[in-house]
UniProtKB/Swiss-Prot annotation:
GO terms for molecular function: rRNA (guanine-N7-)-methyltransferase activity. Pfam families: GidB. This is Ribosomal RNA small subunit methyltransferase G. It comes from the Bacteria. InterPro entries: rRNA_ssu_MeTfrase_G, SAM-dependent_MTases_sf. The gene is rsmG. Transmembrane segments: none annotated. The keyword rRNA processing applies. The lineage of its organism: Bacteria, Bacillati, Actinomycetota, Actinomycetes, Mycobacteriales. GO terms for cellular component: cytosol. S-adenosyl-L-methionine binds at G93, L98, A143, E144, R161. Its EC number is 2.1.1.-. Belongs to the methyltransferase superfamily. RNA methyltransferase RsmG family.
Amino acid sequence: MFHVKHVGPVEPAAGDPEVPPVAELGAAPESAAALFGPRLATAQRYAEVLGTAGVERGLLGPREVDRIWDRHILNSAAVAELLGRGDRIIDIGSGAGLPGIPLAIARPDLEVVLLEPLLRRSEFLTEVVDELGLAVEVVRGRAEERPVRDRFGERDAAVSRAVAALDKLTKWSMPLLRHDGRMLAIKGERAAEEVDRYRRVMTASGAADVRVVTCGANYLRPPATVVSARRAKPPHPKSARTGKAGTR
């Protein structure tokens, strides 16, 4: 059970090293009501947990609190535009639950698995899922591990946010997808440059129709930038070698 503390500026005591101030968690924007509908209260509770326990446990920087809605929750939920009804998705390197938890709240029809290699983060995710009452599975593991691939292969979509460069991310994502399933990686403003840099490796890993799309243009400034790639064929054995998964 999470206990929400007041989130506000913290002044260091005399003689203490300077600490970065904790920003204020703002109210949910109007667009959140449209995205989350009757589950807005669940999204608000998640925002509170991120702004308190998420900061205390080092999963979110203290200066990110006032940007939780736009930069983190809505940015993640916007990917729902690219998902079909009832899609089975896996969130690779879920960290604090982004983008998987906002997607699960906005789209209860989705089957969501949160994959996270670090114990403290997977424990946090389990607590959050229980607190919010979500039908979401939390798994501690890495995308490149054989047991993970055997159990969670054939997904409709593999989503991620700020996990790794596209060469590694594609190698981890493609084996978890069904034929024509899609990797949806939330990236920054240089996504197109990254695609150009790694396109050859992505193709060798079984990716096709690689493109950069935007989501949430009606309510996000800037909108979410997503690299979309379809699994066209099984990845070449050499391109799926085991490596260390990225962390946030």
